[in-house]
């Protein structure tokens, strides 16, 4: 009885990935089927706040610790966190059997509204239209949002469309983008019990 029950349990969708370069040292641990718990330390306060949105709204347990060359700027740290997070997601997803594959979300915050659509297609691609109203959000360079998502898609092997439809406050714009990204991920990463052993593509592979 115990053996049968254990055999019927789905494999945990977890991963741990480290990236060490001359510019950054990063470790990402995650559980795609978590409850949104997070432990985050990148040295960039606003970026930690955005990563927390991914954990909380994606219901992903996320542990990210990064040490980077912030005496230069945040570029390498933000981009490399995106790369490492993408690698961890790809590892945790595995063969994609039963995956819903597609996810989308609209998220508002006061005057700001963003839409994000994701496809675990196996083909990296980013289309991002976010006209930030300010170059800096705290100590976070708003241009680095693009670098984060580009790093993520290249290594998670997803197609990602991000559109900020309305917004006058850069903080609100960024927050709606990251929250919508999280909720789109949550949808796409769900397992469809009706197709639990099927790869969601007519090709038979992704």
Curated annotation (Swiss-Prot):
It comes from the Bacteria. One of its GO terms (biological process) is L-histidine biosynthetic process. SUPFAM superfamilies: Ribosomal protein S5 domain 2-like. The keyword rRNA processing does not apply. It catalyses: D-erythro-1-(imidazol-4-yl)glycerol 3-phosphate = 3-(imidazol-4-yl)-2-oxopropyl phosphate + H2O. PROSITE patterns: IGP_DEHYDRATASE_1, IGP_DEHYDRATASE_2. Transmembrane segments: none annotated. GO terms for molecular function: imidazoleglycerol-phosphate dehydratase activity. Its EC number is 4.2.1.19. Pathway: Amino-acid biosynthesis; L-histidine biosynthesis; L-histidine from 5-phospho-alpha-D-ribose 1-diphosphate: step 6/9. One of its GO terms (cellular component) is cytoplasm. It is found in: Cytoplasm. Keywords: Amino-acid biosynthesis, Cytoplasm, Histidine biosynthesis, Lyase. InterPro entries: IGPD_sf, ImidazoleglycerolP_deHydtase, ImidazoleglycerP_deHydtase_CS, Ribosomal_Su5_D2-typ_SF. Belongs to the imidazoleglycerol-phosphate dehydratase family. This is Imidazoleglycerol-phosphate dehydratase. The gene is hisB.
């Amino acid at each position: 009885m115990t053996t049968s029950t254990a055999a019927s349990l789905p494999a945990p969708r977890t991963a741990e990935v480290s990236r060490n370069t001359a510019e950054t040292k990063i470790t990402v641990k995650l559980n795609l089927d978590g409850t949104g718990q997070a432990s985050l330390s990148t040295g960039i306060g606003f970026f930690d706040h955005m990563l927390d949105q991914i954990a909380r709204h994606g219901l992903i347990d996320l542990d990210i610790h990064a040490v980077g060359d912030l005496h230069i700027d945040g570029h390498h740290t933000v981009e490399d966190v995106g790369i490492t997070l993408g690698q961890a997601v790809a590892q945790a997803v595995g063969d994609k059997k039963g995956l819903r594959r597609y996810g989308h979300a609209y998220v508002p915050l006061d005057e700001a509204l963003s839409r994000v659509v994701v496809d675990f297609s196996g083909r990296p691609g980013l289309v991002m239209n976010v006209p930030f109203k300010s170059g800096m959000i705290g100590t976070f360079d708003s241009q680095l949002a693009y670098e984060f998502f580009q790093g993520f898609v290249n290594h998670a092997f997803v197609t990602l469309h991000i559109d900020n439809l309305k917004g006058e406050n850069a903080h609100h714009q960024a927050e709606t983008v990251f929250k919508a990204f999280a909720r789109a991920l949550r949808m796409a990463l769900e397992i469809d019990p009706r197709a639990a052993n099927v790869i969601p593509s007519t090709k038979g592979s992704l």
